């Protein structure tokens, strides 16, 4: 059956227990060198349903969606689309059949307009030229369908992340997608933007679109998900109705054991020794003045709404942005930090919220990434001592539980949780004493989150003089892992709260600026 044949299939009925199966995987397997990514996966997706796929990083979710969307070919098993076996040769082939995917890392061209992105490589033509009037008219219809109030002529680069995601959905609708794969669609959205996305998902479901929904945010699934499938180590563990399955059951299936607590017991206790003092730091139009202290053995949280200035303050202390005024003291010693290189020399590390862009050399091996910030320590006369590099990397792989076949594995091939551990290893090997973790658990699964939390606590508790700043948009994460929480609003700290004596409501009160009303 060709993509053209598939596009001519009849409209799909609304979802439900008797809805027709649109897509079915039978015994699907996929292998890579040294890794079995999928092992005999069975899965069915029905018209008009939202079917969640959950699993730890490395469970096989990404490989699964790439097989369905034509980016990979299965080594074993069969994929059935409308009951007929298919083997898409490319993502374009799958799109032609009505299968669209919205990646977590959006696939848009910033310098092109909204309309040009929606119909990229499919623009209506008038003779040899693009018919921009027809293009913008068609794009406007797609935008109206999802309720996105932007002009089709607006450059995509000028849109917010949430608006760009809506453009991706509009693009999928322009393909007449009957199967829509969504990969971590809410990871970069605010609460109100998530509400808007869920409204669109519900409308698509009512129109008979089959949606495969991949997410780590189990708590938000109840509103939209009909069924949930759990993968672990490339195998199908269970499929069940979401309404009759508790979050704890899903987590237990994901990690292979009951997970009684979301956060490990804290071992670290702050001392009276101040590692970092920030006094009246400011950058005109961005933040400030900001003042706070970080103590040895402490995990200090930065809370606040998007754009409140938390990341900008951390980047200024790390030397990635230049403040206009204020001072930074290590202990009682003033320091001037004009670049990340100087910050690193002073023992300050910053783990970016975008680890793939700023934290890793994705095309390099695990070993090279771990030693990247301290290459001089394993070099002699300008030559790298590869045996030392390997030994050091293997030590951190063991200590941090990094799942990789060897330290020669390319970093790009590892899961998000393991990539995050590599970034942490890099700074530990450098001997950093002040660590800024910026959204460290974004896009990683519940088991990997627990491991990252344990690492942060271990760093603060090990008695080597480390202090940790945790920047997070997840209030339960801040309440579960920190000693104190500095709350930001419009570039200023509006309160510093003792974690054990506060709650989400008080944090939100200060984050919204109501404490200054």
From Swiss-Prot:
Subcellular location: Cell inner membrane
Entries under SUPFAM superfamilies matching the protein: P-loop containing nucleoside triphosphate hydrolases
Keyword Translocase: yes
Limits of the ABC transporter domain: 23-258, 269-515
CDD domains associated with the record: ABC_Carb_Monos_I, ABC_Carb_Monos_II
Lipid bilayer topology: Peripheral membrane protein
One Gene Ontology cellular component: plasma membrane
Binding, ATP: 55-62
SMART domains: AAA (SM00382)
Pfam family of the protein (one): ABC_tran
Keywords, comma-separated and alphabetical: ATP-binding, Cell inner membrane, Cell membrane, Membrane, Nucleotide-binding, Repeat, Sugar transport, Translocase, Transport
Catalyzed reaction equations: D-ribose(out) + ATP + H2O = D-ribose(in) + ADP + phosphate + H(+); D-galactose(out) + ATP + H2O = D-galactose(in) + ADP + phosphate + H(+)
Protein origin, superkingdom: Bacteria
Cited function: Part of an ABC transporter complex involved in carbohydrate import. Could be involved in ribose, galactose and/or methyl galactoside import. Responsible for energy coupling to the transport system.
Protein name in UniProt: Putative ribose/galactose/methyl galactoside import ATP-binding protein 1
Native organism: Burkholderia ambifaria (strain ATCC BAA-244 / DSM 16087 / CCUG 44356 / LMG 19182 / AMMD)
